[in-house]
Amino acid sequence: MTKSYSEESMMLESQSSSNWTDKCHSSSQDERDVDKTSEPMLNDMEDDDDAGLNRLEDEDDEEEEEEEEDGDDTKPKRRGPKKKKMTKARMQRFKMRRMKANARERNRMHGLNDALESLRKVVPCYSKTQKLSKIETLRLAKNYIWALSEILRSGKSPDLMSFVQALCKGLSQPTTNLVAGCLQLNPRTFLPEQSQEMPPHMQTASASFSALPYSYQTPGLPSPPYGTMDSSHIFHVKPHAYGSALEPFFDTTLTDCTSPSFDGPLSPPLSVNGNFSFKHEPSSEFEKNYAFTMHYQAAGLAGAQGHAASLYAGSTQRCDIPMENIMSYDGHSHHERVMNAQLNAIFHDS
């Protein structure tokens, strides 16, 4: 009986031990399965945490950018490369670069001024007291080249007046006077716009008395008046006739004074290094004052003016009347009054 009991107990213990080992094996397998399933879950959680952190960082960056944009509304956003720090070497390079640029500009201006000075010596305009400006020099050179090209194209010697008008086209009045003085002409003789502006009764007087000195003075310029002309350099000028004013005082008709004759219009001057040559020069007799030869009989004056007859008993007398006292722009009536006053003073002077 005891043997059987012990055997049964041994069998029960063996069965219980086998069941325990099976349970241990099964529990270990379950733990392994749990570990295998929990690992991806943990990885997923870690990934979610990283994504959340990244998302938070992105949101922070966006907020910072928005704040910067709000701040940029008040100040303009600077573009381009960042400003480098100024060092001594960079400052020295900048200084040398600036000095080289200044030297290049200085040389360029010196060359331009030298070229303009050479051009001033070639164009037909020279003055010791007045120097042409840059724009006037270029305009005069352009007109001079165009006029010479027209002469070469036509092959004929042009009229002096047309040549001077083409030469002075578009120039200012002081430059025109300088050109006229260099060519020994009066600006009033070849400027049609001046004669158009004058009244009709003054145009004839201007044409008759163009031998008067003419000067043009511009305010603001330091140089003396330009283009002062002498009567000895005016061509084709016919003085006013004073014979009709003297006829009432004498028995015979007086002859009018005539100007010396010239060969014709001069050819345009040729400029070679600033020297101008003409075909011929005006006569020296033209430099003298106009002389009025008065022929009268001594017997004709004896009845009315006894003392005047004894004073002017010669056959012919020569009377020189100053031109500055006669020549004016008032018309014929003023000249007649001047002549009457002078003759009365001569005849009644004792």
From Swiss-Prot:
SMART domains: HLH (SM00353). CDD domains: bHLH_TS_NeuroD6_ATOH2. One of its GO terms (biological process) is negative regulation of Notch signaling pathway. It is found in: Cytoplasm; Nucleus. Residues 7-18 have a biased composition (Low complexity). InterPro entries: bHLH_dom (IPR011598), bHLH_transcription_factors (IPR050359), HLH_DNA-bd_sf (IPR036638), NeuroD_DUF (IPR022575), TF_bHLH_NeuroD (IPR016637). Residues 44-72 have a biased composition (Acidic residues). The keyword DNA-binding applies. Residues 22-38 have a biased composition (Basic and acidic residues). In the embryo, expressed broadly in a subset of primary neurons in the brain and spinal cord. At 28 hours post-fertilization (hpf), regions of expression include telencephalon, olfactory placode, epiphysis, cranial ganglia, acoustic ganglia, Rohon-Beard mechano-sensory neurons and motoneurons. In 2 day postembryonic brain, expressed in many brain regions but absent from subpallium, the ventral preoptic region, ventral thalamus and hypothalamus; sites of expression extend laterally from the ventricular proliferative regions and correspond to freshly determined cell populations. GO terms for cellular component: cytoplasm; nucleus. A motif (Nuclear localization signal) lies at residues 82-88. Keywords: Activator, Cytoplasm, Developmental protein, Differentiation, DNA-binding, Neurogenesis, Nucleus, Transcription, Transcription regulation. One of its GO terms (molecular function) is DNA-binding transcription factor activity, RNA polymerase II-specific. The keyword Mitochondrion does not apply. Residues 1-91 are annotated as: Disordered. Residues 76-91 have a biased composition (Basic residues). Residues 96-148 form the bHLH domain. May act as a transcriptional activator. Differentiation factor required for neurogenesis. Acts as an upstream activator of isl1. Efficient DNA binding requires dimerization with another bHLH protein. This is Neurogenic differentiation factor 1. It comes from Danio rerio (Zebrafish).
